């Protein structure tokens, strides 16, 4: 029983870890707790449902398209709501309150246009089950762990092995010095919002 609950917690925790990665990417550069991130995550799930169930795009294309949409939404939030505050030199609390407002807007738009009733996401990986002794593991749980690990490895590669990742880390350490070195910090921040939205 304990082993079963440990694995259930691990599979669920992998999903939460991906959400936390999005939070930490933005907090690392802006020192901003992005309260709209959870709403963006919910928006991505609803859009994926629309692509897969309503528009019949198929599971993989639907999920990839929804990731792209949430990434673009992240950029829009930064460009429309947060970048103007940075340019005005507004205090951090202004950006924090803005993200709370954005979260409320996204949540209420979802309720108005999609509804608030509970819906089950399509079972992508079937109902197969793997038995390891007394532990029963569904294919969905296995794939949640695999996909989460793969996405995290991709994010680690981007942050630590690419030029844009170097620019992100430079902006995190000292944004003013990064600007003096020719780094477009606003672009780096927008790219970070895109990554956070995709993840």
Residue locations for each model-derived region?
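Interfacial loop-to-helix junctions that mark the boundaries of transmembrane helices
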Residues: 1-8, 55-62, 90, 130-145
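Alpha-helical transmembrane segments in multi-pass membrane proteins
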Residues: 16-20, 40, 44, 48, ...
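Alpha-helical transmembrane segments of polytopic integral membrane proteins
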Residues: 23-26, 48, 73-74, 78-79, ...
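Short helix-capping/hinge motifs at transmembrane helix termini and TM-loop junctions
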Residues: 31, 53-57, 86, 114-118, ...
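Alpha-helical transmembrane segments within multi-pass membrane transporters and channels
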Residues: 56-102
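Extracellular/periplasmic helix-loop junction at the C-terminal end of a transmembrane helix
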Residues: 103-131
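Helix-loop-helix "hairpin" substructures at the membrane interface of multi-pass membrane proteins
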Residues: 136-199
């Amino acid at each position: 029983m304990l082993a079963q609950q440990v694995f259930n917690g691990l599979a669920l925790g992998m999903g939460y870890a991906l959400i936390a990665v999005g939070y930490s990417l933005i907090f690392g550069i802006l020192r901003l707790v992005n309260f709209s991130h959870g709403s963006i995550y919910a928006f991505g799930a609803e859009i994926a449902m629309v692509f897969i169930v309503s528009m019949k795009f198929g599971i993989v294309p639907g999920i990839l398209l929804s990731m792209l949409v949430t990434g673009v939404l992240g950029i829009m939030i930064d460009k429309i709501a947060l970048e103007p505050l940075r340019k005005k030199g507004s205090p951090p609390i202004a950006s924090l309150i803005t993200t709370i407002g954005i979260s409320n807007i996204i949540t209420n738009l979802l309720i108005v246009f999609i509804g608030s009733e509970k819906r089950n996401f399509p079972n992508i990986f079937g109902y197969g089950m793997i038995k390891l002794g007394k532990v029963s593991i569904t294919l969905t749980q296995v794939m949640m762990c695999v996909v989460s690990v793969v996405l995290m490895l991709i994010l680690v590669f981007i942050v630590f092995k690419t030029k844009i990742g170097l620019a992100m880390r430079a902006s995190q350490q000292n944004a003013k010095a990064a600007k003096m070195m020719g780094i477009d910090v606003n672009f780096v921040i927008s790219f970070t919002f895109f990554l956070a939205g995709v993840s």
